[in-house]
Amino acid sequence: MKTKKMNEPGKIMLLFLVAIMFTVQAVAQNLSVSGLVQDGTTGEGVIGANVVVKGTTNGTITDLDGKFKLQAKQGDIIVISFIGYKTQELPAAAQMKVVLKDDSKQLDDVVVIGYGSVKKEDLSGSVVAIKAEEMNKGAVTSPEELIMGKVPGLAVAQGDGGPGSGSTLRIRSGSSLNASNDPLIVIDGIPVANNSAPGTPNALSTINPNDIETFTVLKDASATAIYGSRASNGVIIITTKKGTQGKIKVTYNSSYTFKDPYKRFETMNADEFRQAVTNQYAEGTALGDAARNLINLYPQQSTDWQDAIYQSGLSTDQNISVAGKAGFMPFRVSLGYNNERGTIKTSKYERYTASVNLSPKFFDDHLRVDINVKGTINKNRFADSGAVGAAAFFDPTKPIYGIDTEDPTYGSNLYNYNGYWNWSTGKNTPNTLSSANPLSLLYDVDNAGTTKRSLGNIQLDYKIHGLEDLHANLNVGYDVAKSTGGNYTVPGSFQTAKDSDFKNIGRGNDWNNLRRNHLLDFYLNYAKNIESIQSNINVMAGYSWQHFYYRDLSIYKSNVTENLGTKEGWTYNDDEGRYIQNNNTPSPWENYLVSFFGRLNYSFKERYLLTATLRQDGSSRFSKSNRWGLFPSAALAWSIINEPFMEKARDIMSNLKLRVGYGVTGQQEITDYLYITNYSLGNNTTSQYMGSYLLKPDGYSPDLKWEQTATYNVGIDYGFLNNRINGSIEYYQKRTKDLLNTVSVAAGSNFTNMITANVGSMKNEGLEFNINAVAIQTKDFSWELGYNVTWNTSKITKLTATYNPDYEGINAGSASYGSGTVLQKHQVGYAPSTYWLFQQVYDENGKPVQNAVVDRNNDGQITNDDRYMTKKSPMADVYMGLSSQFTYKNWDLGFNLRASIGNYVYNASVADNGSLNAFSNQGFITNYYKSAVESTGFTLTSSTEQKASDLFLENASFLKMDNITLGYTFKNLFTSKLSGRISASVQNVFTITKYSGLDPECNAIDQSLWPRPRTFSLGINLNF
């Protein structure tokens, strides 16, 4: 039978029907998905959220309104994710509305460490991260104030009361005697130099606190060794705020502060002083008659010198930032202005800041770019802090301004210097032993400086296509600071007249300094979750190059009639009769640091963790034989909470981890090129032949090398009730070897008899404990507490190359009176800077006997051999921090307490001014401490030995309330887009201490510290 062939129209019809069937099937399987992704809190669209079909590479991101379109199939699962939100998985639908909920824990779990980041649960070293919302509140103008008292093991010692003054930071005490003890500061991946430009107290002082997102404090060597030769004193990593993916938001912060200089020295007023001097000196004697004549020059005059120099301080801090996403570009831009009028007249500080951050992504998010640029201008009008002591002890019976006083020998205007009253021994002949009029110290000297700083970097992180577990990271950065300024003392002032070389002509000092730091880092990072063996591995290896360049110019000249401040040099012009500008040669120097580094993080079953790092540094500061140093570290951690046998305990315990670490770090913050034989130009004032044309060799140390610190650390992290209660306990021990010390060398073996060499060692150990708790949590009320305590001890174990029981140690600290009275020493067996004093003699009633100290060696004479090491030092044995935060509905109240126990201060102000003998044959008369004289009864001129007596060594332990803040948070004010917070705060609320000086938190030797004011602030924060 023949088969009938289909004709052409039939074929076409059949093909058409088949096509329709396949099309219907395809339409049934394919789905065009449209949707909106919203923020669960604000309801706003989330820009840049990832929308992906699960199990495929088919995906997109949301647009500026949070909308997206995607092709999918029936039954597909759509995965929606974005940083800071909980990931959602939903069935595909033609129309989708997705609400993302906040997942702040996801962000909390990531901690920034050196050259990367790690989940908090995977940390094996001693690391503390402080987020913006956890930082101290109130009138904060310097970054270190944000974390004061917050971190166990970190001591933040406030600067004096001057505007713009910075603090001193110490992590687990210092590791050096003659090199730096400052921690390494890393800002957005740039390690910055600690030797800040003149006019800037530390490396942080030019950073706007409002720009800071997080602080990460690395304390033990297993965490810090990745920074090698600069990490012996710990590391503080600062990340600044970045652009966001959401809609553009504007934030404005404003605060106004009043500063009260409430602390005063307790001295006599004019009437008390006249009476005391009259009672002290007998009438009819040469000394008594001279004293009476001086206090009766102006019988009706009464001056409160402390009131004369102090003023109420006022400050304002204004900051505005704009953050969001413009097109594909997340960005943040900020501007800041801070203006402080100090509590001592003439003092003033201004800071202008600007920052820009851009953080775009390219190539399907494979290339992430971070661009950061920060600029700062600091302007400082410095007041002479010596005016504090001068005001306390200047004769209260004398006027501020010069009075036309007749003298039988010298005529009129005997005591008038440029309009200010000052002590004189003759016409235009100042008394060189007396202090200047306190107001003259402030107004006859113009001392000002300006520092301009720019800090920036561009960081590229590329996720390799086809090998997404491998990242390549390149970071190129810079830090440049230029400081200019000078001081000028006016002609005719007491200060210029007191200078025997220049008499009454003006004089000045000019500086012009440059600090430049260039950085290049490159590293590869491979991270892989190997499910088959229940392991996570993260390997990083890299290279770093850093160049530091410094240029300093400082010129001292006389016979000037104006403040030449920022001019770069002067030369004398005979025609004009004064110094004029000329070109001077500055003194530049530089050094390089080249490094290779690597790190391995490995975890098994999320229970057993290993971290190992290795860094090799090469520094041009050292000779070729000692140029390279190797700095290894290793840490193990056991996440006990993840063990099966802890399953029942997890109802109560949320974290339990044991950590053990060891590592070696270095110290290279020393003077450059001490190993080289340098030649210096002779002084042009020398009487030697050839004078300034003579080149002479300096001493050198060819074998100089790194100071090295080996650190052991054991820690336990704990958490209860879903980490509602959490904290850690740490024990650490640091052993530093090859400490730098100045030692003698054999005659003829060098160009000097003393050189710097690596001969010392020191031991440092301590315990840390901290606890954080949400004590109460209800719908409307919460109470959060944080407490930390650190115990620390340090001891020098070696100071010479070979054992020498007769070695007397190194002089470490001196008072400024006399020719510089030594009060502290570094000595083997004692803490660094231990006080070295004479032992005071007391009578049978327990009263100190003036100018009587113990002859401890019984040789019949009082010499320095009778001094003893007191076993007391300025370092605290224990320091603590306590923070508390109450929240009720929209109200919040918080405070911060800080304590220091076991620290001692030598009260040199009392030692120098604690005797009733205000007048002698020196031709001037001074006030004195009332309470000191009342307690000791001293009436004679104190001897040099008396001024170095342990009588004036005081326990300076203290408890301070640094801050208390009350705030109210509001939302939807006038419009749904306006929210914010208003606050009132008090800083330096109270201090509890037995110390008799103005403030126990001062340098080891207290000589007229500029008192810290109590401040009252009002602030407002607005978010648009």
What are these regions (language model features)?
Residues 311-330, 335-338, 352, 433-487, ...:
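Outer-membrane beta-barrel transmembrane strands
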Residues 342-355, 366, 372-376, 382-384, ...:
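Small-side-chain secondary-structure face that scaffolds active or pore-lining regions
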Residues 293-294, 306, 435, 439, ...:
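Extracytoplasmic gating/loop element in the C-terminal half of outer-membrane beta-barrel translocons
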Residues 1-376, 384-385, 428-429, 455-456, ...:
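Short, small/polar-rich motifs associated with maturation and membrane association
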Residues 271-301, 390-440, 491-506, 551-583, ...:
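Surface-exposed loop/turn segments flanking beta-strands in extracellular/periplasmic regions
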